[in-house]
């Protein structure tokens, strides 16, 4: 009975993927940045982190305005394979909320493929998400103070409160995407290297079709989701991630 339940869950998960319109990863058009109207949106722009690529893929847009999603890139060959950047541009997603009296802004990057030991698939998998969290005392751009930072590390979270100045470029956290030789997976880490900025779109600025596609897509193609690839901003996952990232 337990095996049957697992099999049904796997089939349901596959159906959820098939229900979304998937297009080639390098044809997904990033959603243009919007004019910031709320304090939370303005704060997300002010603390927009920059991403330096040390190893692996460059970030791409995961979804476009009509809800069509990236079909990712099958793991094969070199770490950066055919994913050295889209001519259409790239995207970073932001969502924010209160956590234990601190204002948390999560920024998430999508990668067409990632590396991790995933038996029996091999050393990599289609689709990957990495994220950074900026912790503020209040959700404003004018008079807020950066209290701490967190990153999705090779294992668990890397948390710092306060952030070291060598990792900051003004109000922007410097983040590096790299391959961790110890745990044999791709992840993000703090860096002193300057990176690039991707087109920022906040969760509440996303078109409904795009947001629903991000929520309803199962981004983990591995058998029984052993790679644990999840869109970190979807309801039910977002607060779980922020609770784990809390650095105080």
From Swiss-Prot:
Keywords: Glycoprotein, Secreted, Signal, Virulence. The keyword Manganese does not apply. A motif (Hepta-peptide GHRHDWE motif) lies at residues 124-130. Glycans are attached at residue 143. One of its GO terms (cellular component) is extracellular region. The keyword Glycoprotein applies. It holds the Pfam family NPP1. It is found in: Secreted. Secreted effector that contributes strongly to virulence during infection by P.capsici. Key residues/motif important for the effector activities are degenerated in most NLPs, including the nlp24 peptide consisting of the conserved region I (11-aa immunogenic part) and conserved region II (the heptapeptide GHRHDWE motif) that is important for phytotoxic activity. Belongs to the Necrosis inducing protein (NPP1) family. This is NLP effector protein Pc121494. It comes from Phytophthora capsici.
């Amino acid at each position: 009975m337990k095996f049957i339940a697992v099999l049904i869950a796997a089939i349901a998960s596959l159906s959820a993927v098939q229900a979304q319109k998937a297009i080639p990863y390098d044809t997904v058009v990033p959603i243009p940045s919007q004019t910031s109207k709320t304090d939370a949106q303005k704060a997300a722009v002010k603390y927009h982190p920059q991403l330096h690529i040390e190893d692996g893929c460059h970030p791409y847009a995961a979804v476009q305005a009509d809800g069509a999603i990236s079909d990712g890139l099958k793991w094969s060959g070199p770490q950066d394979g055919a994913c050295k950047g889209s001519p259409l541009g790239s995207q970073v997603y932001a969502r924010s909320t209160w956590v234990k009296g601190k204002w948390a802004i999560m920024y998430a990057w999508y990668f067409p493929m990632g590396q991790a030991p995933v038996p029996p698939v091999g050393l990599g998998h289609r689709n990957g998400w990495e994220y950074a969290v900026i912790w503020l005392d209040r959700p404003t751009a004018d008079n807020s103070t950066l209290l701490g930072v967190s990153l999705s590390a090779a294992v668990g979270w890397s948390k710092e409160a306060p952030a070291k100045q060598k990792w900051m470029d003004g109000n922007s956290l410097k983040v590096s995407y790299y391959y961790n030789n110890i745990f044999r997976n791709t992840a993000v880490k703090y860096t002193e290297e300057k990176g690039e900025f991707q087109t920022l779109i906040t969760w509440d600025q996303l078109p409904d079709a795009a947001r629903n596609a991000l929520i309803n897509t199962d981004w983990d193609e591995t058998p029984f989701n052993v790679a644990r690839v999840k869109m970190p901003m979807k309801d039910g996952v977002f607060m779980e991630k922020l609770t784990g990232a809390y650095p105080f």
